[in-house]
């Protein structure tokens, strides 16, 4: 199931936050005129356009990351997760030569390690791009061009692109030279 089929349709998005901050973040997003706000565990889902997501990235003091949902896929086991991620048109989201990283959160009875979920997800993305383009993207865990978020819950995974880059609490932070 594709989370956004037409450019004029509302996009499915979510902002992550520390647990117990969900009601506070939901109130903050409401104050930012963000449409369709729904608090969930460790995140607040919302709908809107890219401008809404960028506004949250710019003004939210409570969100850690903002993610554009691409798809919800079956994740009852590693093979189902791989197939679901392989079905996503990654060539539309990663430019030629772009680097990627995969952040995984959550587990289930079959997928018990977030590192394994991230590795299997990365394999599916890389294999899809290799089949479509004939070349594999490089992985850059620290500063990727595209950061993919995979959140497993029970037998499903929500797959998206992290729009915030570094965690939002690091805005304006400069490392000592």
Regions found by a protein language model. Give the residues of each.
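Accessory substrate-recognition/RNA-binding modules or partner subunits associated with SAM-dependent
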Residues: 2-146, 154-156, 163-172
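Conserved SAM-binding loop and adjacent beta-strand
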Residues: 174-177
């Amino acid at each position: 199931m594709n989370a956004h089929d037409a450019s004029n349709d509302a996009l499915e998005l979510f902002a992550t936050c520390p647990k117990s901050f969900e009601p506070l973040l939901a109130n903050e997003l409401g104050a930012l005129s963000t449409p369709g706000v729904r608090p969930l565990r460790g995140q607040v889902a919302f709908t809107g356009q890219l401008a809404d997501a960028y506004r949250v990235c710019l003004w939210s003091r409570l969100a850690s990351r903002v993610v554009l949902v691409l798809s919800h896929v079956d994740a009852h086991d590693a093979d189902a997760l791989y197939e679901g991620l392989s079905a996503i048109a990654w060539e539309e989201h990663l430019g030629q030569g772009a680097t990627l990283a995969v952040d995984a959160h959550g587990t289930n009875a079959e997928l018990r390690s977030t590192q394994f979920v991230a590795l299997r997800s990365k394999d599916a993305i890389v294999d899809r791009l290799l089949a479509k383009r004939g070349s594999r993207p490089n992985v850059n865990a620290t500063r990727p061009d595209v950061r993919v978020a995979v959140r497993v819950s029970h037998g499903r995974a929500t797959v998206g692109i992290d729009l915030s880059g570094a965690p939002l609490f690091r805005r304006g932070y400069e490392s000592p030279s």
